[in-house]
């Protein structure tokens, strides 16, 4: 067994740079995944793979093949610092959450940042403007943007249509001898009048086979859901499953796998999960059926959309195949038998829409100080909505059906507000489960009202943002020497509306200051400093979204050696 493991490890280590005839591993370490292609995320399907970077930042990132730099972007959210390279084989590679760019790319980006006097920028390049060689270092791995930990988010796209492609299908090797793990199977029974029932089914596991021991005797229209994950060797992360296939009596009734995606698929991700279980019970059950007609690029065309009817005296042999990209397979098997009486299954979860809001209609609910509007197509299907207004607070209870687009809200502003109060007044929100944390809701003010779009569940009220952002130095002090520092760090935080803009100056000259909002961190690298003065006057001006401003000043000193 030890010899087998050593052989596997050796294969993984020595093959990291032998990805395919044409492409290199973007990192100089074996590919271990913390996220797989097509994985279910909160608001989208994962359009790349997340490659682990030994839990740290700063690992060299290389171009997988020759190509042209076509785009580079710096953002405090999303992909953070990201590079796009168009290759000559019809694909584009994407390298996201970088700590920094290569010197060649960094020089171009900094010129734009200093010209625009802004940290966040985006640059599109002409074909052939910046040639990139295979294995050329294009940056170093990091944790910028919306990343929750150090890693490289890597994508491969079809250049012609921007369609994300599964990198594992295009030559990138990941050692994987572990079949998917199935945690639970759920049966859904569909009733009349937009009602359904859910039951968890106990499974018995024997290696890669999961079985339901007892025959299920029931009747009616059914669908199936599951919870599960996949793992790869040498990694503890629970990642998404590549392929799933449901068959009834040998006939395929529902299946899909993640070879590629289109970005619009992600907008409808909630249709492929039990939204009520996810939103209320915090269980992400993936459905193996579609109760609502909706197009997904990866979904196979099957006759019944995964739904099946159990009728008297009929037997239904159900098999669900789960497969990872390396063809490791797990199977679930169960038998259902039709009966004419009420089924003997006890369903612990019932959902009944007694008086639902219908997607093809618009609704407006008026209160004393606000109006709530439910636009047409706010939800994919009829749904119950519960809301209440008291003590100047609108409470919208948690949704049980997936929203298609948000609701809208308008508060009437008090009359006679002075200009400062009018600027600072805003809509606040308490999210369920986070009662002490007020969230700012962006709204436009006009004609004595403040309007907010795309709102969801939560508690809404009028509040004021009166505090400017706080600014505190981390690794330096006013009036002290900074010769031993290569970077100046400051803790910058705003209590409500968030930071809108900022500018830093040293001895009167604008200097690039980077911003990482998730860490409440701003910093200046001394390599950006052009002054040779021994005394450095640092001034930082930070403004939040509603216009509150804070200014910070520090006098710093260096010993200049002639």
Tell where the protein language model's regions lie, with residue ranges.
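Proteolytic processing hotspots in large secreted/extracellular or virion-associated proteins
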Residues: 343-360, 381-426, 476-478
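Short edge beta-strand/loop segments characteristic of extracellular beta-sandwich folds
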Residues: 225-229, 410-414, 487-495
């Amino acid at each position: 067994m030890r010899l087998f493991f050593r052989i596997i490890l050796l294969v993984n280590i020595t093959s990291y740079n032998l990805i395919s005839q044409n492409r290199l591993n973007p990192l100089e370490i074996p590919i271990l995944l913390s996220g797989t292609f097509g994985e279910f995320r909160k608001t989208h399907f994962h359009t790349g793979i997340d490659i682990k970077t030994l839990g740290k930042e700063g690992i060299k990132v290389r171009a997988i093949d020759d190509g042209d730099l076509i785009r580079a972007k710096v953002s405090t959210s999303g992909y953070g610092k990201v590079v796009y390279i168009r290759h000559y084989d019809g694909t584009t590679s994407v390298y996201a959450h970088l700590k920094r760019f290569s010197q060649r790319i960094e020089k171009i980006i900094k010129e734009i940042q200093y010209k625009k006097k802004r940290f966040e920028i985006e640059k599109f390049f002409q074909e052939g403007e910046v040639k990139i060689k295979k294995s050329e270092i294009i940056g170093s791995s990091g944790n910028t943007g919306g990343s929750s930990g150090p890693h490289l988010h890597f994508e491969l796209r079809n250049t012609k249509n921007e369609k994300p492609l599964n990198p594992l299908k295009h030559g990138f090797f990941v050692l994987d001898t572990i079949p998917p793990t199935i945690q639970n199977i759920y049966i859904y029974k569909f009733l009349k009048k937009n009602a359904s029932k859910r039951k968890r089914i106990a499974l018995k596991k024997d290696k890669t086979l999961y079985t339901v021991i007892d025959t299920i005797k029931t009747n009616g229209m059914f669908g199936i859901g599951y919870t599960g994950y996949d793992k790869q060797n040498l990694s503890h992360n629970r990642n998404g499953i590549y392929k799933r296939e449901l068959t009834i009596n040998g006939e395929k009734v529902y299946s899909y796998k993640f070879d590629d995606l289109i970005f619009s698929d992600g907008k409808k991700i909630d249709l492929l999960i039990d939204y009520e279980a996810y939103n209320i019970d915090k269980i992400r059950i993936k459905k193996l059926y579609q109760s609502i007609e909706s197009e997904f690029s990866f979904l196979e065309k099957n006759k019944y959309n995964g739904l099946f009817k159990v009728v008297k005296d009929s037997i239904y042999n159900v098999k669900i195949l789960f497969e990872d990209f390396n063809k490791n397979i797990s199977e679930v098997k169960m038998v259902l038998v039709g009966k004419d009486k009420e089924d003997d299954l006890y369903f612990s979860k019932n959902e009944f829409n007694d008086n639902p809001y219908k997607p093809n209609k618009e609704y407006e609910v008026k209160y004393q100080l606000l109006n709530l509007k439910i636009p047409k197509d706010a939800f994919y299907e009829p749904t119950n909505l519960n809301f209440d207004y008291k003590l100047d607070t609108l409470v919208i209870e948690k949704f049980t059906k997936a929203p298609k687009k948000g609701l809208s809200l308008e508060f009437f502003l008090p009359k006679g507000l002075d200009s400062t109060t009018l600027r600072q007044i805003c809509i606040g929100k308490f999210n369920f489960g986070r009662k002490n944390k007020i969230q700012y809701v962006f709204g436009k003010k006009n004609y004595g009202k403040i309007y907010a779009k795309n709102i969801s569940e939560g508690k809404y009220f009028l509040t004021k943002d009166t505090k400017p952002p706080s600014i505190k130095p981390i690794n330096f002090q006013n009036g002290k020497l900074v010769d031993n520092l290569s970077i100046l760090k400051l803790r910058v935080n705003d209590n409500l509306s968030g930071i809108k803009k900022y500018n830093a100056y040293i001895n009167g000259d604008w200097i690039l200051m980077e911003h990482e909002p998730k860490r409440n961190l701003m910093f200046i690298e001394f390599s950006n400093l052009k002054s040779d003065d021994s005394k450095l006057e640092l001034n930082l001006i930070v403004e939040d979204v509603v216009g509150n401003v804070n200014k910070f000043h520090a006098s710093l000193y260096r010993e200049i050696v002639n």
